[in-house]
From Swiss-Prot:
Pfam families: GCP6_N, GCP_C_terminal, GCP_N_terminal. One of its GO terms (biological process) is microtubule nucleation. It comes from Mus musculus. Keywords: Cytoplasm, Cytoskeleton, Microtubule. This is Gamma-tubulin complex component 6.
Length: 1769
């Protein structure tokens, strides 16, 4: 047996109820309740244990009969004032005894048990009120005592003594009151005499001044001090005093001056002191009182007027009840029993309150009964409380009953379906009912938290607004009283699915300004949850989850296996054509976009599984209904981040349509420029040849004229001599003398002639030498112009040699570089442009030739003064563009003429890149490909302005001055340096290593440029080298990646020596890998104007070489279509002052260098990291300074790069670079991790770099030793911390090398420059890109160089590695969190919090809320829903992510179809071939067909595959586009095989069609119906071709007849020529109209439409409209059939005309009319019919155009009636 304490403990545990959490109430403290129960138990135990002896000696009550005991109990009840209970007890006992078939055998025993149990029940609440004034709601009221049944008196009647004393007190009190009334002054106590209280006591001055004054409402009702000033309550400062300008007096004294008020009494200052009335003598007033003649409740001192009668209720409850009974009795008596009023049932107010609270929860009670058929609560008739009528109570209770009815109906409506049964109403309805249950739970919490001590009116007031909401929700759900009242009409079915969302949205819009709005918003948000999840899955991943078929889309699985347009049109279909049936109203305008978006993603998954949309791990913004301001901002931010990241992925993963078009336009412009250059070269050659021929002809003519002139003179002299001889023959002496003189004269003439001939020979030699020089100069010019042709040849030769080299290297050891020949390149420049400023500069040395590495560099011979002047003169001539003076000098036979290497074809670069990706382990020379530097050529900077004319190669005009201004105090050094040329040039050529060819004109961006410019600018200077320069390595290594850090250049005095590694070969040639020592004092040189290059400008930077240099303002940078290569101002020297770099340019692939890098004096040993080659540009476009004391550089404003920052390479410039380091550089590439926003610990050195994904960009940290000058572009970080960046694709790489560096964060660059939001700064970058944790600085040395990492123990390394793996796994798990689709909405049924609609109730009546419960909605949600309209909220929360993703998907689909699938080329192929835009193809095809047709071949002979295929292949050979890949898609097809070809039928070949094969997925756009339309147009065009062929054949026959039969003069022949001409005009008009409208106008409209298409549906629609327009304008529609019939008839007449012409031969010419044709009358008749039809067609088309139908026919009218032929006739 357990102890007493244990038993009591168990008893208390059993009695305590189970702990239940009741919303709105504090939880019951079980310990306290248990303690109180124990106290009761022990009190009962001890009360029975320790009793007095007197109480123990009681008469033995067990001997009394049980009935007597019951009667004793009933007597106790009557004594206690419970008469009805006593009567009820006696009545029940009598019934029990009188019952004949009582089931209980021992009735007495049962009654005895009940008697023993009497008084042992729980104490009643009201019985504790032992004091009349304790907690009495009537305290303070003057209420007369009621009868026996009044509970308030029954409290006293429990004790007889107290009852008697109370009666005595009452009598005494009544006597005292009567005496006081008789003895008191007149008027005292009058307002309270009797039952009525008038409430208007005017007995004394105190009452008048306080309660009866005008401002009585503004003061307290009682004042205990006569001197208290009554004033207005305090008013806040912000109150509006405009209505208080005039103050009303506080009291108007009626005795002083009744009826008259002066104006001064109403002024505010006159009322500052209230006037007090004097006391009157009451007895005098009573004696002199005269009653007013007016019948009113007028008293002394009261103003006259109507007074209200007092309310009956002021007489007290008892009086009201009696009066009600009296009136009811009167009605009964008057009606004679006709009016059966319900019997009044008096109920305690506490019971009514309890029943009311129960019925609010749907609980039936005695007061409220439930009507089962209508599911409504009904108030029992006659229920009332004391002091109120049944009708008034019934009106209050009926409202409460209505609330309970609505609650009950809503509870039934929102019941969850049975688990396991299918809910046909869908998920949206389930979500709506769960939201409704949540609201009802909140409502229950409000009811349960209401204390039962409130009055009925308070409860009715508190639940008024909640009741209105319940009533509204019942009406909303169709279960309200109004809905059920119209039972005659069929009830509308409650909407489900998207219609329910539209219904809720419309209701929310209609109720946006009342109290139901927040509840509707809550229900709308809950109901939208399943739909937004469906939309989320469909839009983002194309997943279709619709269990109940309630959403917009229906899946046809059989069509999903199709691979044509049926997959697109029938695989996923909308459930209805009405938009409202498919989507909610608020998504109506983007319903189609959402539908197409999911279809597009599924199509991309099917066609291109590797598309970035299918595998992208960028987190998507959520789609949900949001009313919170913070969440809305988060959504908008997430959308912006998502769009930015996806666009970055898109730019990296594929080429966009716009980029492709831009590239094509650039290539087109380049082609145009090259063509123009070629044309100008050919024209100049022609003009030169013509000029040379003209000069030669002129010379020949002059020589011939000179010969004729000499002959004439000689002949004249001979005649004169002959005449003289005749005169002198007579005299012999004279003859002899003449003979002697003649001989002497002949001798003199001979001598003179020899002298003249010698002089002529001398000057002819001089002129021939001059002519030869001129020819040589012209030859040089011509050679220079043919440079590009030579260059192509040499490039191909060089490729062959390089392939031979590779083969030889693979077979035998590498030979010295000098063995292999290689083409050289030259850097040409014009003469010095500052020569006119007074400084002498020998132009003979303005060019350095970097020849073939296999040949020694030939020394440049000195140029005589005349050659120099000639070069200067030629510079001003028309041929001076880009010439060098050495072009006019003779070239040694052994010296190979240098050429300019303009680049490597893009295909070779791509192949090399692919090879480098496929072979990660390769020999050293081929390990790194040229992909990094050369990819910059194929990439285009979309932010630059397209200047194709400037971006291409040489223009014929003279160059403009692009040289930098040179300080005048430095220019005198030019003359000094020119004197050193002869002494140093030979040494320099010996000591300089044999240079390899310059790389093609695009230098490696920025970092490659300084050395390239250095060499180019050195070509204009005399370079003095130190004596020890000859000790350098004879040749430099050739690096395929062409990295700048491969060069070992000595500049100035203070650079340390570098041991050169063994030289290596380079395929493409680097410009700056020679070991060049430059002397101390280098003069400044104004660089020559560099050549333009289509692949990028090569020298836009100001470079200074030397020790003491002054400032240089950099020249304006040039645009480059492949990205700018030199935005950095680079200074080389010892003391270099500041340079402000030019503004960097934008690049679509990201700017590659925003860091200002300084290289200091003392640089220690650095092992360069293995740089990762980059597809999108080089790694260093930076402002780099080399020298001893380098001042600061103000960095340009940094630009963000969508592909990541690429200028973070770990590049160090140091002293001792070992072979191992360069091998590292040759072999592979490592990449340090990328930065998030804060520095992370440094990476471990020995971790292998992970493979970089395609979107990754080479990024490394560029830095120098800590001893170098600090960067000014950011705060200095500690040496132990190094920022690392995490890539945007969740993969990281560990750098193989770290440096002690001071790195500037990009956000801190510059002073006062605002930080731009970059891709690395996004909020969820941490989730996307888990960075590997890194170790400290000491652990980061490479294995080749000793460092502190050797001292770290293995255990610490293992611990660090384990920690890194754990951190990596943790970050990886954050990436992949599974998002489950919830199929149960239990969370929505959890107990809600009362904050949901807390702003609807006044704060004084708000329900108590547990402060520990957090609010369900954030506070800004309520404010936001009040500030913004619902459409705006839905647009910002739902439309923003949807619109963002839909636009991304649509653009991706458009880019995929246009770029990957080349859709536009298919459209062009269809236009070329099926629409016969390619005239060569159409002409040859039609000629071949019609020739065989005209030859009389049968259908079996013509329409067989062999013949048709040969015809098609021949036509394609003639075609301009026959070699395109799409030409293979063409084939002939037969619709049917005719038995014979109908004669004179224009559609004789309608059985033949030209088919175009379209593969999946292009057949979604180019469908079978589209191909049929193409075929119809082709058929009509073939008819036109038949007409043209027919007319050509007619013309041929007429011409042959005219030639053979000589019928040209025949009259009939002339007539037939005119007939043919008119027919030809008609056919050509139709052909021109079709070509213009279909081939040109419709195509241009189609192209314009394609330029702006947004998604795949629009492409499909645009193509269908294009074809429809072509068919419509080609008159091939059914409505245009009458017009087409006329045209067919005309065509038939043309064919008939031909057959009539060729069927018979011409007759002989018998008469004056000439030859005649036998069928001429028939042909004349055919022509007449043709003319009739053509005029009729003209009239029909004119009417169509005038009516406005088919306005495009105006073109046809204009063509056919251009000279008003038809109109006039």
């Amino acid at each position: 047996m357990a102890s007493i304490t244990q038993l009591f403990d168990d008893l208390c545990e059993a009695l305590l109820p189970a702990a239940q959490a009741r919303p709105g109430q504090r939880s019951v403290n079980r310990k306290r309740a248990k303690r109180s129960l124990k106290r009761v138990a022990y009190n009962a135990l001890f009360a029975n244990l320790f009793q007095e002896d007197t109480h123990q000696r009681q008469p033995d009550s067990s001997k009394l009969p049980v009935k007597n005991k019951v009667l004793m109990l009933s007597f106790d009840l009557r004594v206690g004032g419970l008469g009805p209970e006593a009567d009820r007890l006696e009545e029940l006992v009598e019934k029990l005894e009188a019952a004949p078939d009582c089931p209980f055998v021992e009735v007495a025993s049962v009654l005895d048990l009940l008697v023993q149990l009497a008084g042992s029940g729980p104490p009643q609440v009201l019985r504790r009120k032992r004091d009349y004034f304790f907690n009495n709601k009537h305290a303070g009221r003057n209420i007369p005592y009621s009868g026996y049944d009044c509970y308030d008196l029954s409290v006293f009647e429990m004790d007889v003594r107290s009852f008697i004393s109370g009666e005595e007190n009452l009598c005494h009190h009544t006597v005292q009151e009567a005496l006081q009334v008789m003895e008191a002054a007149p008027g005292t106590g009058l307002p309270t005499v009797g039952l009525f209280s008038i409430g208007d006591s005017c007995g004394d001055r105190f009452e008048r001044d306080t309660r009866v004054s005008l401002f009585g409402a503004l003061v307290h009702s009682r004042t205990y001090d006569m001197d208290v000033r009554l004033d207005l309550p305090p008013v806040p400062d912000s109150a509006d005093f405009s209505g208080l300008a005039i103050k009303v007096p506080q009291i108007v004294d009626q005795w002083e001056d009744e009826g008259f008020q002066s104006a001064s009494n109403l002024t505010p200052d006159s009322q500052s002191e209230p006037s007090m009335t004097p006391d009157l003598d009451l007895w005098e007033a009573v004696l002199t009182y005269e009653a007013s003649k007016r019948r009113c409740w007028e008293r002394i001192g009261c103003p006259p007027g109507h007074r209200e009668e007092p309310y009956l209720t002021e007489a007290g409850r008892d009086a009201f009840d009696r009066f009600c009974r009296l009136r009811h009795g009167e009605l009964q008596a008057l009606s004679g029993g006709l009016l059966q009023a319900p019997k009044p049932v008096l109920v305690e107010e506490s019971e009514l309150v309890k029943d009311s609270l129960n019925v609010l929860l749907g609980v039936v009670s005695a007061t409220f009964s439930l009507c089962r058929p209508t599911q409504a609560f009904v108030v029992e008739p006659g229920v009332h409380v004391s002091g109120a009528s049944p009708e008034s109570i019934s009106s209050i209770l009926s409202e409460v009953a209505e609330y309970g009815t609505c609650y009950t109906r809503l509870s039934h409506f929102s019941l969850q379906p049975v688990v396991g049964s299918l809910c046909s109403r869908g998920l949206v309805f389930q979500a709506f009912t769960s939201g409704l249950r949540r609201y009802l739970q909140y409502y229950r919490a409000c009811v349960l938290s209401t204390p039962p001590t409130l009055s009925l009116l308070t409860i009715g007031f508190l639940f008024k607004k909640l009741g209105r909401q319940l009533r509204y929700l019942a009406e909303l759900c169709g279960v309200g009283t109004v809905s059920l009242a119209t039972s005659g009409e069929p009830r509308a079915v409650f909407p489900t699915g998207v219609k329910l969302l539209s219904y809720l949205y419309q209701e929310a819009l209609d109720n946006c300004s009342n109290e139901h709005y927040p509840v509707l918003l809550s229900l709308l948000k809950t109901s939208c949850e399943p739909y937004t999840r469906f939309i989320h899955d469909w839009v983002y991943s194309g997943v279709f989850r619709d269990v109940y078929g309630e959403f917009m889309i229906q899946v046809n699985h059989e069509y999903l296996s199709f691979r044509d347009k049926f997959y697109w049109t029938h695989g996923y279909v909308l459930i209805s054509k009405e938009v409202e049936d498919c989507v909610p109203v608020f998504l109506k305008h983007i319903a189609h976009d959402v539908y197409v978006c999911g279809k597009t993603i599924n199509l991309l998954k099917l066609c291109c599984p590797r598309h970035y949309l299918c595998w992208s791990d960028v987190p998507v913004p959520r789609i949900s209904v949001i009313f919170s301001l913070e969440e809305l901002k988060e959504i908008e931010k997430d959308c912006a981040v998502y769009v930015g990241r996806m666009e970055r992925v898109a730019r990296h993963s594929c080429i966009s349509k716009e980029e492709k078009e831009l590239r094509m336009e650039i290539a087109k412009q380049e082609l145009i420029v090259h063509a123009r250059e070629a044309a100008s070269r050919v024209l100049s050659e022609l003009s030169d040849r013509q000029m040379a021929e003209q000069i030669a002809q002129d010379t020949r003519k002059r020589e011939q004229f000179q010969r004729l002139k000499e002959q004439f003179v000689k002949d004249q002299e001979r005649r004169l001599a002959a005449r003289q001889e005749e005169l002198d023959d007579d005299f012999s002496y004279a003859r002899e003398l003449r003979d002697r003189e003649k001989r002497l004269k002949a001798l003199e003439e001979e001598l003179e002639r020899k002298a003249r001939q010698a002089l002529v020979d001398h000057y002819s030699k001089l002129s021939a030498e001059a002519a030869r020089r001129e020819q040589k100069a012209l030859w040089r010019i011509q050679r220079h112009r043919l440079e590009s042709a030579r260059l192509r040849f040499l490039l191909e030769d060089q490729k062959c040699i390089q392939e031979m080299l590779r083969d030889m290297e693979a077979q035998q050891p590498q030979e010295p570089p000098s063995v292999f020949p290689s083409t050289g390149s030259q850097v040409t420049s014009t003469g010095p442009e500052h020569a006119g400023e007074g400084h002498s500069c020998d132009p003979g040395f303005t060019e350095l030739h970097w020849g073939c590495p296999s040949l020694p560099c030939a020394s440049t011979p000195s140029v005589p003064k005349s050659a120099t002047e000639g070069a200067d003169d030629s510079g001003a001539g028309p041929f001076s563009t880009g010439l060098s003076i050495t072009d006019f000098l003779p070239v040694d036979s052994g010296e190979e003429q240098p050429v300019e290497n303009t680049g490597v074809p893009f295909l070779e670069v791509a192949l090399q890149t692919i090879c480098s990706d496929l072979s990660p382990v390769a020999p050293e020379p081929a390990a790194l490909t040229a992909g990094g530097p050369q990819a910059t050529q194929s990439e285009y900077d979309f932010n630059t302005i397209l200047r194709p004319a400037m971006a291409t190669s040489l223009s014929p005009g003279p160059f403009q001055d692009v040289q930098n201004s040179v300080d005048s105090d430095k220019q005198h050094l030019l003359g000094d340096m020119s004197t050193k040329v002869d002494s140093y040039i030979h040494d320099m050529q010996e000591t300089l290593p044999c240079p390899h060819p310059l790389s093609h004109a695009t230098p490696v961006e920025g970092s490659l440029q300084p050395v390239g410019q250095l060499l180019e600018h050195m070509s204009e200077t005399t370079v003095s080298t130190e004596s020890h320069a000859s000790g350098m390595a004879p040749c430099q290594q050739l690096s395929i990646s062409r990295h700048v850090s491969d060069a070992n250049i000595k500049v100035g005095d203070y650079m340390s020596d570098v041991a050169l590694p063994r030289p290596r070969w380079n395929v493409h040639g680097h410009v700056s890998e020679a070991s060049i020592g430059v002397g101390e004092n280098m003069a400044e040189v104004a660089p020559s104007r560099p050549r333009w290059n289509v692949h990028g400008h090569v020298s836009d930077a100001s470079i200074k070489i030397g020790e003491n240099m002054s400032d240089v303002a950099p020249s304006r940078t040039r645009w480059n279509i492949h990205g700018h290569v030199s935005d950095a101002s680079i200074k080389v020297g010892e003391n270099v002052s500041d340079v402000t770099p030019s503004r960097p340019r934008w690049n679509v692939h990201g700017h590659v260098s925003e860091a200002s890098i300084k290289v200091g004096e003392n640089v220690s040993d650095v092992t360069p990291s293995r740089p990762r080659w980059n597809v999108h540009g080089h790694v260093s476009e930076a402002s780099i300074k080399v020298g001893e004391n380098v001042s600061d550089v103000t960095p340009s404003r940094p630009r963000w790069n969508v592909h990541g920052h690429v200028s973070d390479a770990s590049i160090r410039i140091g002293e001792n670079v070992s072979d191992t380091d360069l091998d590292l550089q040759q072999r592979g590439c490592a990449q340090p991790p990328l930065i998030l926003e804060e520095p992370l610990p440094e990476a471990e050195a020995d971790l292998k770099p992970h493979q970089c994904p395609p979107a990754h960009v080479s990024e490394a940290v560029l830095g120098v030793e800590a001893q170098s000058p600090a960067l000014e572009c950011g705060p200095q970080l500690p040496e132990k911390t190094k920022p690392t960046v995490c890539s945007g694709f969740g993969r990281t790489e560990e750098g193989s090398l770290q440096t002690k560096t001071l790195v500037a964060e990009p956000s801190m660059l510059g002073s006062g420059i605002p930080e731009e939001k970059g891709p690395g700064k996004s909020r969820d970058a941490e989730d996307l890109s888990p960075c590997l944790p890194s170790s400290s600085q000491e652990d980061t040395a490479v294995p080749s160089s000793p460092g502190p990492s050797d001292e770290v123990s293995n255990t610490e390394a293992e611990a660090r590695r384990w920690g890194k793996e754990q951190a990596y796994l943790t970050d990886l798990t954050k990436l992949y969190h599974l998002e489950q689709y919830p199929d149960s909405y239990d969370s929505m049924s959890e107990p809600p919090v009362a904050h949901l609609v807390h702003h609807m109730l006044p704060r004084a009546f708000a329900f108590p809320v547990d402060p520990q419960v957090q609010s369900a909605v954030d506070e800004s949600a309520v404010q936001l829903s009040e500030l913004l309209t619902l459409p705006v909220l839905m647009k910002r929360s739902l439309m923003a992510p949807l619109a963002a993703h839909v636009s991304l998907v649509s653009k991706a689909a458009v880019d995929y179809f246009f770029v990957e699938l080349h859709l536009e080329t298919h459209f062009e192929a269809l236009r070329h071939f099926l629409l016969m835009e390619d005239g060569e193809f159409a002409q040859s095809l039609s000629d071949l067909l019609f020739e065989k047709l005209g030859a009389g071949q049968t259908p079996g002979e013509l329409l067989n595959p062999l013949v048709l295929n040969s015809i098609l292949s021949k036509a394609l050979q003639y075609s301009l586009h026959g070699d395109t890949p799409h030409a293979s898609n063409l084939s002939f097809a037969l619709k049917y095989l005719p038995e014979v070809f109908a004669p004179n039928a224009p559609d004789v070949l309608s059985c033949l069609e030209l088919r175009y094969k379209v593969d999946w997925p292009l057949n979604i756009v180019i469908t079978e119906s589209c191909l049929n339309k193409y075929s119809g147009i082709f058929s009509f065009l073939l008819q036109l071709k038949l007409m043209m062929w027919t007319l050509k054949d007619i013309c041929f026959h007429l011409k042959r007849t005219a030639l053979v039969s000589h019928t040209a003069g025949s009259v009939q022949f002339r007539q037939l020529q005119l007939f043919k001409h008119e027919m030809q005009h008609f056919v050509k008009v139709i052909q021109g109209y079709i070509a213009n409208q279909i081939l040109h106008v419709s195509w241009c409209e189609f192209r314009a439409r394609l330029a702006v298409v947004g998604d795949l549906e629009e492409i499909q629609r645009a193509h269908a409209e294009y074809l429809h327009r072509a068919v419509f304008r080609g008159l091939l529609t059914e409505k245009a059939a009458p017009v087409m019939n006329i045209i067919h008839s005309i065509f038939s007449l043309v064919l008939k005309f031909r057959s009539q012409l060729i069927s018979q031969n011409w007759g002989p010419a018998t008469g004056p009319r000439g030859a005649e044709h036998p069928n001429f009358p028939l042909m004349q008749q055919s022509y007449s019919t043709f003319k009739y039809y053509s005029h009729f067609l003209f009239k029909v088309v004119t009417k169509l155009v005038n009516r406005g139908y088919q306005p495009h026919l105006e073109d046809f009218l204009l063509r056919i009636n251009f000279n008003n032929y038809y109109q006039d006739s």
